[in-house]
Amino acid sequence: RHQSDWLAVISLDLETYVASVVGAEMPSRWHREALKAQAVAARSYALAHLARPATTSYHLGDTTRWQVFSGETSTTTASRAATLETRGMILSYGGGIVESLYASNDQVSAEAHGHLGASMSQTGAQQLASQGLPFNAILGRYYRGASLARLKRYDQ
């Protein structure tokens, strides 16, 4: 129970979670590189919240307050591919995992996260991908100073 209501909490594999978030946060018809940038941002955000859970009951919610998560209903072929192609990749800064904030567009990104200095615009990522930028360059535009890293459990 959470306060006076029952609360369902799901525990699942990170990559399954990321594929659902990508499918819920971006249209599947968007450029593959934008979807890959979203996958890395979503994975990094989720892992950053393992260290700082939303509540004592769960790490992340499933709404735009955190990341939209709809389970299998939002997972698409495109979101699975973007997740697989970036499997285990995160954003790192100073040896830690970046809480890679993002929002739907530049204005919302600036209003919601501008004081933090690093937040990806999803429509901006789509525009950059359409101009030919790969996902790592897109992430570099929004998360200055951060670098791509691979989680040790994915190293082979």
Named regions from a protein language model:
Residues 1-156:
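Conserved, single-site charged/polar hotspot
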